[in-house]
Amino acid sequence: KEMQLYVKMVIKGIQPAVILCGAPGIGKTFRVKQQLKAAGYTMTADNTVKGKCTPRQLYLTLYNNKGKGDIVLVDDADSLVGPKAPEDCINILKAALDSTADDEGRLVSYKVSGELKDDEGVPVPKSHYNKCGMIVITNYSVGQIDTALRNRAFTQSLDFSTKDLLEIIRGIMPNIESNHLSMSSKAKAMNYLEKLVEEGKPIEVSCRSFITCARIYENAEDDEALQLAEKMIAEQMRNSAIRGGKKF
């Protein structure tokens, strides 16, 4: 609910940006996109920056969505907001997130030599006033976010208990891969995840682990296949739980 409120404030233009921090696979992107869709937004490559991104791509996305009421989604933003983010990207984001700007907007600049052109070869000004809202999603914890960015935006740490995660997944389950996975497979996956948790098995509960379960169940057509499926699921959950190097 807190996340929905932060996103709502950006949608309404009350706050220029929110940075949502949390472990991968907990439904951050899915729920943000659902809320944006409900508010009438269509998120496409034109207003979404995903994963690694050059300063030029970031600037052009902001330039093309500079109006009041526009929303830019920066998804999987680790390479743009973390300790190893390029200085040019940090500077562009700092300007775009400046909450002290006047009614004219936030002055965003891209200091590059020579002429700046968009993907169609059309010249683009190297500075512009921007009034869009920004939603930034990262797997980094709040403390790992660049301090200057952290001070310019609301930040939320999405740290859920296993019980919370199961409730979140159950709530969004009907909409997860609805074109590929049957509700029957998803219900079996949900029940089996809950069973593994109750038994104290090593498991990393996330939307991704749920999808893994459901995909395996989707191909289990008889009792023998079902037993094999559950063995495969247990193995995948065990492998997922022992992965190291998590940022969050």
Residue ranges and their predicted role:
Residues 26, 38-70, 79-86:
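AAA+/P-loop NTPase substrate/partner-engagement loops
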Residues 75-77:
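Walker B catalytic acidic pair
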Residues 1-13:
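N-terminal pre-Walker A segment at the start of P-loop NTPase domains
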